[in-house]
């Protein structure tokens, strides 16, 4: 179809629709109203549905959704359950931003069949790129449901296309929702997103866009050009909340959707609802508000204030607390969706976006002077939407705990960050700067947790400026698209393109995971050591599992396989010794002790993951793993340190599954069928770029898409021993454990150490703990005594000579591992004036003291920061004493002298 064909659809041409060009925006649109001149979209026309009857009056948002789904189900569309808001099946995005995200790229590219065709869905979606508009414009939401009907015309299959799609949209609006035909306009345009593009129609009713109908038949190239594809996808999106708002005629979408939560917040905060006249006039113009263009938005608000007859300042005083209420109501539902679908707040990925939203919500709470915990409001949302999202009810305790933990961390980080902010503002003022740089505001938020609102508030109190317009939106936009981690390229002296001449390797390790010996033919030898076989039982490194090793035996010799790796469908064996000739038959012998250890550890990983989710909660997701013959290092998402009781429970549960000797099933499934059967926990190890998935299932416990080698039954593992847990970054915890013989050897080693300790301490097994406590008490008492003696010695003074004198100020540098740097610096300063003292030790810990008589001229913090910059360190302090740690200690003398000289010159 040409562009003209999409514009002149039979539905319009044959049913009396009038085609016009909007004189305001210049776009082509269709209407049944002969009097209509403009397209009806914003900003071409004001809203005209506020306070008016537009169609039927649904009793709830749920009823509005049901009406839509029922309509399409009666027209042979299969209802499909919503997908999680976390797009774990994709590598390019973190969150689902539209219903089509559920089917990109696998279904849209025709690689796997859709779950139904055609289908209807109502998909919760999250978009944070308009975050600064939420609560202010009346229409923007961070979380919304996109109702959609999709048809997948894959290759030669025809379901339906553009004409039928437009007709369906017209019917659902008029026959289901009761909208008058002449009040609907269809605006023609182009759309792109998620790597695809196509012509589209925006559907407008009384100034409000309620749907977008996209006819996806292009792929977007990296340079932005459009490449036609053979598949034609009907991608529609109907805003559930917007349609409900349209039909109820509320002043804004927040009052329509979140009235129950907003009413509770009003009662607790004492924020009064603005007068109806003001709300009505503002609502009519709110479609034109966009705070990404602050000057235009403020001018619109000034016009409203003039119309209502109040000052602009009074308008802002009335609106600001209400905007905070609206934003808080929106944010807390989105937080419930994110945490309920497994996001753990952190400093990266989807966790970063969850933290961003939680911290913004906490600032809104403070602005409203509400004392209740943020988690309380999130739980209101879960209860309020319990019939729509019943799956979140069982996660309430988990979600409360996560939000409460985030709130505690936020308060702590703000307290710490205020000191950093104060130092920064002081530094800017000392340099004569009047504006806080944008990059510093981002750094304060990301590194120290200081909200931009606080930066602006403190900066203005110091006579500085801080522009935070659109801060949250920009930050969310920067972080919304996944930075696809490039897997480490194989460090080979050969070009992988040289492998193209070889056919795919037959993977014997999948046919029989305990196959120790096999025969194969040599297809090629590259650079004398990289051997390609027609089939192999050597598992190549992948999925966090190390490769097999062993030998290749052939007539006249043998070589050792020290590493195996996979390039595409070809397994390459890196050999030591004389490689076999091309065409030779070889016998491969796999090191089965290593293979079995790897199998036990990999299967144990699946078991431990199930135990982690059972004990800690469903928010636990794999964040990285390495399986070796001796141990497993497994990283997972979690928001708190693991308690000893939890560690014991996890280990006990994992070993119970081992002792139950459950079967471990391994089979191939079509991607769509696998997702239907097991959901998206399949992708614990990350997105799998394959149309057919190898599923490893421990019935009733765990099922994952996994390409590793595994035991046939859990009992083959023997024993799982957890060595410990540690937090490796915010929101990510690491567990290290052993399985099989390494676990047994570890336990035996612990027993040996206990026996040795009994001998050393001359204590029985039962009395060992008491003896250790007694020794610890004695050591602590002795350490206190030693400290007192050191302090007495320091009172007698420290013999040290100045290393330099700068403008009358003497510089002392003192090195000692015997005394703490702070104690030494203070001791030296007691007997000296007009001095700067730096004491440090071999660990790089240092203290910098400025004597009291110099405090009107010098600041230890200024000198200390300069020292840290030069010697790769960091620290903090007060005007007379700065403490920290430096990585380099060789040139301390020169650096402190230069730092002092610069500080004096600035005075």
Swiss-Prot record:
EC category name: ligase
UniProt cofactor note: Binds 1 zinc ion per subunit.
CDD domains per the UniProt record, alphabetical: AlaRS_core (cd00673)
Cofactor(s), names only, from the UniProt record: Zn(2+)
UniProt-listed SUPFAM superfamilies: Class II aaRS and biotin synthetases (SSF55681), Putative anticodon-binding domain of alanyl-tRNA synthetase (AlaRS) (SSF101353), T4 endonuclease V (SSF47077), ThrRS/AlaRS common domain (SSF55186), Translation proteins (SSF50447)
Positions with a binding annotation for Zn(2+): 602, 606, 706, 710
The keyword ATP-binding is assigned to this record: yes
Reactions catalysed according to its record: tRNA(Ala) + L-alanine + ATP = L-alanyl-tRNA(Ala) + AMP + diphosphate
GO biological process terms held by the UniProt record: alanyl-tRNA aminoacylation
Organism superkingdom: Archaea
Keywords attached to this entry: Aminoacyl-tRNA synthetase, ATP-binding, Cytoplasm, Ligase, Metal-binding, Nucleotide-binding, Protein biosynthesis, RNA-binding, tRNA-binding, Zinc
Annotated EC: 6.1.1.7
Subcellular location: Cytoplasm
MF GO annotations: alanine-tRNA ligase activity; aminoacyl-tRNA deacylase activity; ATP binding; tRNA binding; zinc ion binding
Annotated SMART domains: tRNA_SAD
Any one annotated GO CC term: cytoplasm
Family (UniProt): Belongs to the class-II aminoacyl-tRNA synthetase family.
UniProt function note: Catalyzes the attachment of alanine to tRNA(Ala) in a two-step reaction: alanine is first activated by ATP to form Ala-AMP and then transferred to the acceptor end of tRNA(Ala). Also edits incorrectly charged Ser-tRNA(Ala) and Gly-tRNA(Ala) via its editing domain.
Protein name (database record): Alanine--tRNA ligase
Organism: Thermofilum pendens (strain DSM 2475 / Hrk 5)
């Amino acid at each position: 179809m040409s562009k003209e064909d999409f514009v002149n659809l039979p539905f319009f041409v044959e049913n009396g629709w009038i085609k016009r060009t909007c004189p305001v925006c210049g776009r082509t649109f269709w209407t049944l109203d002969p009097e209509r001149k403009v397209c009806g979209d914003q900003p071409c026309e004001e809203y005209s549905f506020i306070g008016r009857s537009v169609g039927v009056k649904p009793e709830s948002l749920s009823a509005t959704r049901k009406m839509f789904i029922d309509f399409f189900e009666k027209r042979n569309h299969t209802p499909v359950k919503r997908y999680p808001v976390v797009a774990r099946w994709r590598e390019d995005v973190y969150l689902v931003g539209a219903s089509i995200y559920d089917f990109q790229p696998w279904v849209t590219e025709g690689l796997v069949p859709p779950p139904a065709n055609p289908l209807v869905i109502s998909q919760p979606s999250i978009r944070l790129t308009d975050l600064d508009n939420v609560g202010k414009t009346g229409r923007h939401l961070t979380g919304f449901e996109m109702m959609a009907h999709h048809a997948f015309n894959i290759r030669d299959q025809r379901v339906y296309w553009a004409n039928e799609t437009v007709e369906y949209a017209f019917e659902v609006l008029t026959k289901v929702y009761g909208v008058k035909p002449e009040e609907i306009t269809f605006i023609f345009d182009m759309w792109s997103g998620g790597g695809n593009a196509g012509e589209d129609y925006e559907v407008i009713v009384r100034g409000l866009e309620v749907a977008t109908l996209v006819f996806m038949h292009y792929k977007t190239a990296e340079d932005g050009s459009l490449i036609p594809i053979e598949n034609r996808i009907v991608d529609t999106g109907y805003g559930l909340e917007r349609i409900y708002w349209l039909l109820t005629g509320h002043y804004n979408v927040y009052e329509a959707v979140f009235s129950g939560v907003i009413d509770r917040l009003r009662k607790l905060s004492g924020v009064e609802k603005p007068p109806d006249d003001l709300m009505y006039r503002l609502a009519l113009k709110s479609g034109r508000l966009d705070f990404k263009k602050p000057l235009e938005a403020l001018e619109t608000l000034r016009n409203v204030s003039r119309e209502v007859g109040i000052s602009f300042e009074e308008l802002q005083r009335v609106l600001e607390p209400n905007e905070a209420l609206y934003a808080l109501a929106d944010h807390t539902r989105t937080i419930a969706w994110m945490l309920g679908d497994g996001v753990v707040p952190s400093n990266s990925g989807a966790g970063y976006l969850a933290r961003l939203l939680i911290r913004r919500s906490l600032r809104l709470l403070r602005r409203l002077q509400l004392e209740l915990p943020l988690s309380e409001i999130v739980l209101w949302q879960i209860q309020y939407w319990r019939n729509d999202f019943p799956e979140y009810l069982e996660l309430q305790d988990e979600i409360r705990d996560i939000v409460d933990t985030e709130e505690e961390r936020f308060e702590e980080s703000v307290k710490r960050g205020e000191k950093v902010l104060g130092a920064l503002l002081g530094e800017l003022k000392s340099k004569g700067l009047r504006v806080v740089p944008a990059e510093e505001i981002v750094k304060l938020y990301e590194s120290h947790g200081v909200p931009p609102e606080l930066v602006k508030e403190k900066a203005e109190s110091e006579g500085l400026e801080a522009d935070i317009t659109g801060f949250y939106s920009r930050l969310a936009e920067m972080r919304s698209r996944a930075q696809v981690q490039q897997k480490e390229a194989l460090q080979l002296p050969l070009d992988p393109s040289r492998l193209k001449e070889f056919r795919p390797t037959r993977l014997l390790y999948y046919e029989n995971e305990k196959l120790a010996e096999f025969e194969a033919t040599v297809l090629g030898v590259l650079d004398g050591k990289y051997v390609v076989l027609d089939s192999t039982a050597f598992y190549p490194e992948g999925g966090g599992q190390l490769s097999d090793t062993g030998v290749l035996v052939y007539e006249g010799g043998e070589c050792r396989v020290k590493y195996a790796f996979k390039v595409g469908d070809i397994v390459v064996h890196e050999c030591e010794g004389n490689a076999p000739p091309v065409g030779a038959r070889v016998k491969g012998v796999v090191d089965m002790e290593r293979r079995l250890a790897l199998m036990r550890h990999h299967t144990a990983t699946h078991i431990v993951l199930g135990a982690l989710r059972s004990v800690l909660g469903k928010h636990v997701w794999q964040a990285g793993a390495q399986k070796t013959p001796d141990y497993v290092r497994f990283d997972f998402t979690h928001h708190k340190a693991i308690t000893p009781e939890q560690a014991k429970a996890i280990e006990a549960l994992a070993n119970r599954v081992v002792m139950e000797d459950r079967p471990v099933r391994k089979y191939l499934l079509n991607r769509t069928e696998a997702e239907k059967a097991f959901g998206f926990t399949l992708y614990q190890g990350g997105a799998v770029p394959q149309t057919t998935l190898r599923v490893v299932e421990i019935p009733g416990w765990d099922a994952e898409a996994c390409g590793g080698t595994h035991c046939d039954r859990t009992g083959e593992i023997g024993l799982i021993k957890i060595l410990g847990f540690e937090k490796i970054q915010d929101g990510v915890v690491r567990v290290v454990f052993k399985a099989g013989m390494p676990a047994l050897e570890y336990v035996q080693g612990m027993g040996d150490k206990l026996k040795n300790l009994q001998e050393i301490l001359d204590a029985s097994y039962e009395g060992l703990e008491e003896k250790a406590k007694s020794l610890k008490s004695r050591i602590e008492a002795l350490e206190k005594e030693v400290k007192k003696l050191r302090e007495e010695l320091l009172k007698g003074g420290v013999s040290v000579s100045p290393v330099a004198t700068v403008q009358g100020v003497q510089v002392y540098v003192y090195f000692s591992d015997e005394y703490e740097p702070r104690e030494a610096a203070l001791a030296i300063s007691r007997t000296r004036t007009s001095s700067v003292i730096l004491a440090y030790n071999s660990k790089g810990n240092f203290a910098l003291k400025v004597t009291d008589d110099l405090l009107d001229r010098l600041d230890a913090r200024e000198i200390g920061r300069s020292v840290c910059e030069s010697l790769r360190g960091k620290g903090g302090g007060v005007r007379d004493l700065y403490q920290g740690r430096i990585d380099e200690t060789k040139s301390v003398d020169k650096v402190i002298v230069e730092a002092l000289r610069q500080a004096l010159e600035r005075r």
